[in-house]
């Protein structure tokens, strides 16, 4: 055995800053679109509409992980398996997907392909697994995405072969070569650039002039007089050009015979029918091998397109172009939306596929002439790829029929909508072909010897090329409708779906750790906040680069490659040629955001406009002008919710009846409710079983003292104003404190502290007039005490569960209302004058807030502690004065109004500023001047609206006073009007204010926060650099 020698060559790196001259850099890119975000938002799956399996065991295998890449031993779905089996196991082994599902797979593949098609230096355990995930997922993704959305916009059946064409735009790799059943092409007959560069054909201007001058036949005669068209369609053609005509017309007939890929045998059969030979013409091209009478029965244009739903629309559009009503550029944009035209793109693609096939069959003896043939065929493909010429070809049935010029033009609104969407379709087609070529070039050019992660890079590049772009329906079909079309139709094998979904999602999740590490390394080495980064100068970073430990150099390179470009930071190896700085997308985005305009920086203005957009959604004038009893469901502008109020607002308080006669001699009381002493005449109550936890016969207690006040829950909060039951629960928390002095040491005399009330259920307490006693509980869990001292206990109960006014009229009870707090004793030595063991009592009560919980939807306003179901919020403008009791409920008109307009308040001064400008909002000012002068005429001598300036000033004052519109106060300009005029003016002003929101947002643009933060962070960064 020999010795093993290892060598190590350290990496030398240097820092190159593309945009390091910036002192500060916003970190929106880091904050919003990193890998951590992607992992958190990772979809749970693609939610197939139906999954069917051949056996229950197949289903078990699909759900479990035993056949997964990681080969886990545990079946993590074991506990939920029973819930997944349906229809007695009658299952077939396919999964029916939805458009949303395919999009999720595509997005995951885009993430992995874009990240790992770059050349990384350090291989981690996670990246090794990601490589396996990509390799496993790629065939399944190709089947799902490439099969469901096939070449040339034809939608096929996934794993279940070709089905039929569908109007879906395919924006992915340019796979025009198709399937050749094993034949290898020696020539590329037609270049792919015919579809990448769609432009006006050179013959169409003169064709249009000819039609306008002498009719359709004159235009066709002009085309057929061109040398290229004489070769393609002429009845008499010389022997030199006859092979071109045969190949071209055979390709047209082949493409017209099928809506998808044409089998090789079928295509050659059509070519043979054209030549009436056994391909002998391919061996030796002589004139006698061709028969001018030999014609194929198949047409040379797609017959099915004549029945397309928008064929008539295409006809009308082309006539508008001929008449000069539509320019050719607009024609191109509009036809991109039409089914008959986009199907034509598929037709021309099939023509090219057929030509490629035919050229591969040409004999070597004709090689010297093949370059000329291919050049002419390329020219024919190019001229027919002009949307205008192809449309003329289609409308005339392959140049055989007259096209009528007497059609109605298309409505302008329809044209504008189609033009807008079509512009983006053409862009996507061009970008798709260009991008796929770029990916293919880089994937093939990778050198696996130099890059230890070459396999991962190539797999990711293939994945990236497969899913480039979007899966998109035609624009006249809503996405929801498109998804319904796919439901239950596009099927995949269950295993195919599992490989695609689980591995794609797992790959994105695995990437999170590596991305988070890179972000922590790069951003953690600089001073920064959430939106501002104090980026150090380039020379400082270059000083740090040599200090990086050699073993960590590769990791640093990878980290900076991942996230350094977010802040304009690049890293280079020593000896690497200096490259021109590359401006990343986010840099362009940041440059645009920082661009100053006359109304502020673009980014700041956009942020303020976005805030205004949210405010406009929150403020709904429609919901405010409707009466509560007209609103259904949850459309009422004040959302139903629980709320807290104080005892002052939550309950109505009643004083003890005739305290002079009801209290014993020597007893005192105060306005704060504190009573010292006993009742003159005591009365009996029943100890509540539910709280005392007794199951024996009812226990009678004797009330010997109590607080000075009793209480009723306010009907405005719990309902029952109309005599019905409560519609809210009101819960209170109380601390009661009782000081008791006993005259004897008798321990059998138990003293209780608590509340008395009646239950709505008369069976709860059948004795002692139905009055029940609920005892308080101290911190030791006791409900009574037997000696002199102080008792502190807590009590919590739902007032709505008590009988309203239950204490009123009870014999010997000195309190009215629903409940009161008392001291009672349970001793047997009880006489007519009360308990002889208790000499002196003092009771104090401390209340918490009343907690109110609705039992249903709240749809009413509260004014003066009364509910109103038939009035809008505007009916209370200026009606809340000092004599009106304002409730603490969010439904009170004062609180409700504040909530409704709170999003607008910050903008009110800005709106007034716009109104005071002399040259803006003239129509708004004129409207209010006319209205207010009309209102002022009814005021006689007190008319405050005599001039335009008076009206303008009033409008500005009213807008600024919007938060206090409910109040009757001098600061509310609306109070000078009648109630109806107040309501009308308020509705008008509020709608105007909402309409002015976007305009006022331009005044809010202020970068002071970012500038101030930048100064502080820059100071800390400079201290690090300067020392």
Swiss-Prot record:
Protein name (database record): Uncharacterized protein VP4
- The organism encoding this protein is Colorado tick fever virus (strain USA/Florio N-7180) (CTFV)
